[in-house]
């Protein structure tokens, strides 16, 4: 008997609690606009069997629904916002062809069931944003001398025998305990934080590879800097040679020998080079041209030419086998000797005697009475 009284009291308490629960205003307003018979051409219950147990409603004309009906119940006229609110309360779209929504507690003629519809909690709310930090049981690590360790946008430099214990390092271990929510956006935000933590917990093999990688990077940077310096030095040398170094004419004996071998060609009779050669010599660099022209104060113009190709030399040697004389670079050795001797004799001609000039006065120093003085004494 007492047990029946207690059960009856529990039922009354549950009924009172259910009566005191008020459904969300959004659900009440949605039920009213769907249940209004004046707007059945825009939104209405979906009565498949024509009875009173419709469990879904259909928005037949979304533009008119957003323009004429939503402002009467809500503070906006945005149909997309209305659909998002339905999703948060557990409504689902029945068919993709039309805007039909259903919920097991949203039924025609059963308004009291709206108390059973609750708003969904967001997935991000289930994950604590900042969990309590773990106890500081991590021991500091030793780093090799001169080793670099990157952390985000900063860089740590370890010295020999020193311990790296900074706030950034402690932040690595605190960040390692952060939970990762199943959201791509949260993963992208936590990616830069988790990467240093994984790097801090690297194995000895990974640490050795990292140190080797940093050493190679430093060596590569040094080589690149040295290469840039050598390129600049090369450019300076080329500029100096092109602008400050002038070619030197060969000596008379060497010029005669080159002329005998056919390497050096004599200037024309008028003492001037053809206009094409002058233009070519002035337009080309003194160090990169194939023919070099040297102009001096005398009207002599010498042109150095490159030797002929090997193919021409072989053809001339093979063609000259039928003759009795030996050729070198297309020139008879006997004629070359004669030209050399004649050129040398012409170069050794004594210069013209010039009339003697009066001797210039000489300056001498004469010491008299421990004094120095300068006097000009004419020679006897």
From Swiss-Prot:
Family annotation (Pfam families): HSF_DNA-bind
Residue ranges, annotated region (Disordered): 268-296, 314-380
Subcellular location as annotated: Nucleus
Entry-linked InterPro entries: HSF_DNA-bd (IPR000232), WH-like_DNA-bd_sf (IPR036388), WH_DNA-bd_sf (IPR036390)
PTM comment: Exhibits temperature-dependent phosphorylation.
Record's keyword terms, sorted: DNA-binding, Nucleus, Phosphoprotein, Stress response, Transcription, Transcription regulation
GO molecular function: DNA-binding transcription factor activity; sequence-specific DNA binding
BP terms from Gene Ontology: regulation of transcription by RNA polymerase II
Region (Hydrophobic repeat HR-A/B): 216-245
Biased composition (Low complexity): 278-296
Locus of motif Nuclear localization signal: 346-348
Gene Ontology CC entries for this record: nucleus
Coiled-coil region: none
Key word Transport present: no
PANTHER family: HEAT SHOCK TRANSCRIPTION FACTOR, HEAT STRESS TRANSCRIPTION FACTOR B-4A-RELATED
Function: Transcriptional regulator that specifically binds DNA of heat shock promoter elements (HSE).
Notes concerning its domains: The hydrophobic-rich region (HR-A/B) corresponds to the oligomerization domain.
Complex and partners: Homotrimer.
Family: Belongs to the HSF family. Class B subfamily.
UniProt protein name: Putative heat stress transcription factor B-4a
Native species: Oryza sativa subsp. japonica
Gene expressing this chain: HSFB4A
């Amino acid at each position: 008997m007492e047990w029946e009284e207690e059960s009856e009291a529990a039922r009354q308490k549950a009924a009172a609690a259910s009566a005191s629960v008020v459904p969300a205003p959004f659900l009440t307003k949605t039920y009213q606009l769907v249940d209004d018979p004046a707007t059945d051409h825009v939104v209405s219950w979906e009565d498949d069997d024509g009875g009173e147990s419709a469990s879904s409603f259909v928005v037949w004309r979304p533009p008119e629904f957003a323009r004429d009906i939503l402002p009467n119940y809500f503070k906006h006229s945005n149909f997309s916002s209305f659909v998002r609110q339905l999703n948060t309360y557990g409504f689902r779209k029945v068919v993709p062809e039309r805007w039909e929504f259903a919920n097991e507690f949203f039924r025609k003629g059963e308004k009291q069931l709206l108390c059973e519809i609750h708003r969904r909690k967001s997935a991000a709310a289930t994950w604590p944003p900042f969990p309590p930090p773990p106890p500081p049981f991590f021991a500091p690590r030793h780093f090799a001398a001169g080793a670099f360790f990157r952390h985000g946008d900063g860089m740590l430099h370890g010295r020999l025998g020193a311990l790296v214990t900074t706030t950034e390092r402690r932040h690595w271990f605190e960040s390692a305990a952060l939970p990762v929510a199943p959201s791509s956006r949260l993963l992208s935000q936590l990616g830069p934080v988790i990467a240093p933590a994984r790097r801090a917990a690297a194995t000895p093999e990974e640490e050795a590879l990292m140190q080797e990688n940093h050493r190679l990077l430093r060596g590569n940077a040094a080589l690149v800097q040295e290469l840039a310096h050598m390129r600049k030095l090369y450019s300076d040398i080329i500029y100096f040679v092109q602008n400050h170094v002038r070619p030197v004419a060969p000596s008379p004996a060497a010029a005669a020998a080159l002329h005998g071998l056919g390497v050096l060609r004599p200037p024309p009779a008028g003492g001037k080079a053809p206009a094409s050669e002058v233009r070519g010599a002035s337009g080309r660099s003194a160090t990169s041209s194939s023919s070099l022209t040297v102009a001096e104060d005398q009207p002599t113009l010498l042109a150095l030419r490159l030797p002929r190709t090997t193919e021409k030399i072989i053809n001339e040697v093979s063609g000259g086998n039928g003759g009795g004389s030996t050729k070198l670079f297309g020139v008879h050795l006997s004629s070359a000797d004669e030209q050399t001797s004649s050129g040398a004799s012409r170069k050794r001609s004594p210069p013209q005697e010039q009339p003697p000039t009066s001797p210039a006065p000489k300056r001498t120093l004469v010491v008299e009475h421990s004094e120095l003085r300068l006097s000009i004494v004419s020679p006897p």
